[in-house]
C-alpha cells in the first residue's frame, strides 16, 4: 500500500517537473490534489481576513507492518470528516490524505519505541495541480503514558501561511489531547467556525476543559502580514550574514538549493526563511521544506528546487548525481557544495548595503517581529533599488491590458553592474510571474513593497535639492 502511495505521489511530481520546463506554474513533490473552488495567490503570506483557519486536523501514528519490523505512518484521527463529496472531490481528498503521512514522518520507516523524545514543530507544503498551496503545520511528540511508546504527529492542514498562530493552536490541541481526544473536538469546531482575522486583529475562542473550567483563547494575527509566515531566528542562528546573502543570490537566479539539518523544526524554519527573503517575489519551483525518504530522488532533478533533507540522509544526497547545487549544512554552518560564483551574483555595492544594514543594531533586537523586520528589510530594499521602477515601464492599451517594456526597463538603471544583474533577473520565473500580475492590474498593488518604493522615491526627491545646494 505505502509503495503504491509513494509511487503515485512521485509520478505526480515527475509530471509536474515536465510541465515546469514548458511553463511557469508552481510545483512541489507533495502535489496531492486540485481544489477548483478556491483560488489562491502565489505567495503564501498574502491571505485576506475572513477565511477559515483550517481544512483538517489529523493525528498521524506509526503502525507496524504485517510480518515486517518496519512501521508505516497512518491517519488515526481526522476532523472534520467530509461527507457528500462529489466523486472527483472524493478522489482528490483521498490522494491528499494518503500523501500527508509521508510528510509527517519523512524520516523513513525504521522506528523503535521510546521513553523520551523531544517535541518538534515543523511544517510542509503541498502544491495543488492548479498551483495553489496547502500547508501542513505539525507537532511531533511522544504521547503521555507509561513505558516505551512511539511518537505521533498532530497535523493541521490550512491554506493560510501564519506559522506563529498555528504553533499556538497546536499548543492548545496538545494540551487537550493529554486529557482526551473528545476534548479536542469542541475546540477545533469553534476554531473552524471562526473567521481568520485580518492583519492586526484578534479572534477569541471560548473553550471548556474538564477540571479547569471555561477558558478564553485569543489568537492575534501580526499587523505586518507579509512576514507572518516566517521566523528568521533559526536562519540567523545557523548561518552568517555572508552565507545568507549567498543563499539569497542563488535563489534569485533560481538555482538548486539543499538544506541539511538534524531537526525537522530547523529545516522547515530555515527553508521558509530563505524563501521569504525573495519577497515580493515568490519561489515558483519545487519547494519541499522536509523531503520524505521516499522522495530523495528530488535532488537529482534538472529543474530548480529548494528543499530540506535530514542529516541522516546526507551521504545518500552526496552520492546522488547533482549539478550546480548549493548544499548547505545548517548544523555546521558550512557549504558542502557550491557553484563557486555565489559571491559574484549580486552587484557589489548592493551586497555591501545589505550586509551593512544586517549588521547594524542586531544585538538590540528582542522580539521575533523585530528580528524578522530587521532581516527582511535590507533584502526588500535591494529589490526596491533594482526593480522598484517597474510600474513606469508597463505601457497600457485602451482596455487596460499592460505590456512590460523589458529593454527600456533595464536601460533605466544607470549602474552597469546593476544593469548586468537585472538582465539576468528579468529572465527568471520569479520576475515573470510578478510582472504578469502587474500587467493585469491597472494600478500597483497597495502593499508593503509598494509602500517601500514610494518611500525610496521620496528620499531621492529630498536628496536632489540637498545635492544642488552643496554644489
Swiss-Prot record:
Q: Cytoplasm among the record's keywords?
A: yes
Single GO molecular function: guanyl-nucleotide exchange factor activity
Q: Which Pfam families match?
A: dDENN, DENN, uDENN
dDENN domain segment(s): 361-445
The record's account of tissue expression is: In bronchial mucosa, mainly expressed in ciliated and basal epithelial cells and weakly in alveolar cells (at protein level). Tends to be down-regulated in lung cancers, immortalized bronchial epithelial cell lines and precancerous lesions.
User: InterPro entries this protein is in?
Assistant: cDENN_dom (IPR001194), dDENN_dom (IPR005112), DENN_C (IPR043153), DENN_domain_containing_2 (IPR051942), Tripartite_DENN (IPR037516), uDENN_dom (IPR005113)
Q: Where in the cell is it found?
A: Cytoplasm
The entry's keywords: Cytoplasm, Guanine-nucleotide releasing factor
GO CC entries: cytosol; nucleoplasm
| Ranges for domain uDENN | 55-204
Domain (cDENN) spans 226-359
User: What is this protein's function?
Assistant: Guanine nucleotide exchange factor (GEF) which may activate RAB9A and RAB9B. Promotes the exchange of GDP to GTP, converting inactive GDP-bound Rab proteins into their active GTP-bound form.
Name of this protein: DENN domain-containing protein 2D
Gene name, please?
A: DENND2D
Amino acid at each position: 500500500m505505502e509503495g503504491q502511495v509513494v509511487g503515485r505521489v512521485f509520478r505526480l511530481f515527475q509530471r509536474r517537473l515536465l510541465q515546469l520546463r514548458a511553463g511557469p506554474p508552481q510545483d512541489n513533490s507533495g502535489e496531492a490534489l486540485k481544489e477548483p473552488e478556491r483560488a489562491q495567490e502565489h505567495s503564501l503570506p498574502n491571505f485576506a481576513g475572513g477565511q477559515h483557519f483550517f481544512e483538517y486536523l489529523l493525528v498521524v501514528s506509526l503502525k507496524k507492518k504485517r510480518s515486517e519490523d518496519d512501521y508505516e505512518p497512518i491517519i488515526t484521527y481526522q476532523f472534520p470528516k467530509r461527507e457528500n463529496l462529489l466523486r472527483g472531490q472524493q478522489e482528490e481528498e483521498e490522494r491528499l490524505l494518503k500523501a500527508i503521512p509521508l510528510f509527517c514522518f519523512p524520516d523513513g520507516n525504521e522506528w523503535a519505541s521510546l521513553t523520551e523524545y523531544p517535541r518538534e514543530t515543523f511544517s510542509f507544503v503541498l502544491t495543488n495541480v492548479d498551483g495553489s498551496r496547502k500547508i501542513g503545520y505539525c507537532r511531533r511528540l511522544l504521547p503521555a503514558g507509561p513505558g516505551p511508546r512511539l511518537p505521533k504527529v498532530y497535523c493541521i492542514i490550512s491554506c493560510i501561511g501564519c506559522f506563529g498562530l498555528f504553533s499556538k493552536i497546536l499548543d492548545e490541541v496538545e494540551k487537550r489531547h493529554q486529557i482526551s481526544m473528545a476534548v479536542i473536538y469542541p475546540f477545533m469546531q469553534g476554531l473552524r467556525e471562526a473567521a481568520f482575522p485580518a492583519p492586526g486583529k484578534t479572534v477569541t475562542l471560548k473553550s471548556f476543559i474538564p477540571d479547569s473550567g471555561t477558558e478564553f483563547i485569543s489568537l492575534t494575527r501580526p499587523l505586518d502580514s507579509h512576514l507572518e509566515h516566517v521566523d528568521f531566528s533559526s536562519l540567523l542562528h545557523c548561518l552568517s550574514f555572508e552565507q545568507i546573502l549567498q543563499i539569497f543570490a542563488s535563489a534569485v537566479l533560481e538555482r538548486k538549493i539543499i538544506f541539511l539539518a538534524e531537526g525537522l523544526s530547523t529545516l522547515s524554519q530555515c527553508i521558509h526563511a530563505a524563501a521569504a527573503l525573495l519577497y515580493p517575489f515568490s519561489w515558483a519551483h519545487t519547494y519541499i521544506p522536509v523531503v520524505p525518504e521516499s522522495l530523495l530522488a528530488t535532488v537529482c532533478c534538472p529543474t530548480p528546487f529548494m528543499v530540506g533533507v535530514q542529516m541522516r540522509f546526507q551521504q545518500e544526497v552526496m552520492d546522488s548525481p547533482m549539478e550546480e547545487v548549493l548544499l548547505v549544512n545548517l548544523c555546521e554552518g558550512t557549504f558542502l557544495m557550491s557553484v563557486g560564483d555565489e559571491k559574484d551574483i549580486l552587484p557589489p555595492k548592493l551586497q555591501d548595503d545589505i550586509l551593512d544594514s544586517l549588521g547594524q543594531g542586531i544585538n538590540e533586537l528582542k522580539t521575533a517581529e523585530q528580528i524578522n523586520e530587521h532581516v527582511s528589510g535590507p533584502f526588500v530594499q535591494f529589490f526596491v533599488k533594482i526593480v522598484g521602477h517597474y510600474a513606469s515601464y508597463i505601457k497600457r492599451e485602451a482596455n487596460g491590458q499592460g505590456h512590460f517594456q523589458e529593454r527600456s526597463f533595464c536601460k533605466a538603471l544607470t549602474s552597469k553592474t546593476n544593469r548586468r544583474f537585472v538582465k539576468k533577473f528579468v529572465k527568471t520565473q520569479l520576475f515573470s510571474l510578478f510582472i504578469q500580475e502587474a500587467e493585469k492590474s491597472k494600478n500597483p498593488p497597495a502593499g508593503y513593497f509598494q509602500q517601500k518604493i514610494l518611500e525610496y522615491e521620496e528620499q531621492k526627491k529630498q536628496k536632489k535639492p540637498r545635492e544642488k545646494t552643496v554644489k
